[in-house]
Amino acid sequence: MAVKKFKPTSPGIRQMTVASFDEITKTKPEKSLLEPLKKKAGRNNQGKLTVRHQGGGHKRMYRVIDFKRIKDGIPAKVASIEYDPNRTSRIALLHYADGEKRYIIAPNGLNVGDTVVSGPDADIKTGNCLPLKNIPVGTLIHCIEMRPGKGGQLVRSAGAAAQLMAKEGEHATLRLPSGEMRKVLAECRATIGQMGNLEHENITIGKAGRKRWLGIRPTVRGVVMNPVDHPHGGGEGRSPIGRKAPVTPWGKVAIGGKTRRKKASDKLIIKRRTK
């Protein structure tokens, strides 16, 4: 995939870059694998705002993705590589030998006509899915389960890859894209290869309107609000925040404070992410 630039015919176009979509082979999605996607606008089931800066955006349909890959031993042919508006990576449509169709997230190097398979006896080949205990140490992997049978949860965004560092007993040690070193049960499955759409990190949004197309609303600084809206608000003219340290809209320290809950899985983290 390449990044496409434009002639600077307007201030918005001047900085904007988009993906070339060279790898896309089909524009209309598989109808049987579509579901309606209702907009949440950052609200919970009570209608209360729980996530700020969300709302609007282009209408989307959800593509049902197979994250579990439990059709063991049945080969599937890659029929197409498609765009998915709900994620940064591309998706691949698989036609299984028994006639079933499923989507998977597309790793780098997976092309139309390739054959993929899942199961403990699968080859170490891009797109194949197998338990961590059957994958050689040093292999790049993605779409990793955290619990056996739950489906891939880790390393699913464009260009991401984890590395299998060691296998010891019932656990495998992974190095995640964040730099975190973590143990995962060796029975958990992962897919071989690095995530596709590598150039995604080089895309420049270019203008505010494009953020709105994505369903992202403006992020307003607290210092320009009124005191009723934010602890940083108020004052005459351009005033400082009036506190020793910046805080969130709810008064908690914004910089340096730990936000991660204590979990039973903390003991599986060998080294925290690099900041």
Curated annotation (Swiss-Prot):
* Family matches, as Pfam families: Ribosomal_L2, Ribosomal_L2_C
Q: Which GO terms describe its molecular function?
A: rRNA binding; structural constituent of ribosome; transferase activity
Q: Which cysteines are joined by disulfide bonds?
A: none
Tell me the segments the record calls region Disordered: 224-251
InterPro entries per the UniProt record, alphabetical: NA-bd_OB-fold (IPR012340), Rib_uL2_dom2 (IPR014722), Ribosomal_uL2 (IPR002171), Ribosomal_uL2_bac/org-type (IPR005880), Ribosomal_uL2_C (IPR022669), Ribosomal_uL2_CS (IPR022671), Ribosomal_uL2_dom3 (IPR014726), Ribosomal_uL2_RNA-bd_dom (IPR022666)
Function, as annotated? One of the primary rRNA binding proteins. Required for association of the 30S and 50S subunits to form the 70S ribosome, for tRNA binding and peptide bond formation. It has been suggested to have peptidyltransferase activity; this is somewhat controversial. Makes several contacts with the 16S rRNA in the 70S ribosome.
Q: Per its record, how is this protein called by name?
A: Large ribosomal subunit protein uL2
